[in-house]
């Protein structure tokens, strides 16, 4: 979509958020990153035959489920689903933070 962003307020009310770094190094050259990117691109291309979308992020979970059969390759379907669901999870997380619903945020 875009590189636009917004800040979401956090009211913890005694809750704590733990942020960790596994320190695991990833190489985009030797990893399967390029394969996953190509599979995601194929999922988008297939979905565009039945949906008027520019990115996988244009779909809701429900829209993806309604049109997922347009993605012929099972692995590409899995990659597309991951992209759509993670985007929706982020949207839900921001909504939960704006509503001071730290419990829902934590479950996401």
Predicted regions and their residues:
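C-terminal nucleotide
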Residues: 1-108
């Amino acid at each position: 979509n875009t590189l636009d962003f917004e800040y979401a307020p956090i009211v913890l009310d005694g809750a704590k958020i733990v942020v960790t770094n596994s320190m695991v190094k990833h190489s985009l050259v030797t990893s399967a990153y390029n394969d996953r990117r190509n599979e995601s691109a194929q999922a988008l291309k297939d979905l565009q035959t039945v949906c008027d979308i520019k990115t996988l992020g244009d779909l809701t979970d429900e829209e993806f489920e309604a049109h997922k059969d347009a993605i012929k390759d099972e692995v590409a379907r899995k990659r597309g689903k991951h992209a759509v669901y993670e985007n929706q999870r982020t949207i839900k997380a921001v909504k939960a933070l704006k509503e001071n619903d730290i419990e829902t945020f934590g479950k996401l």
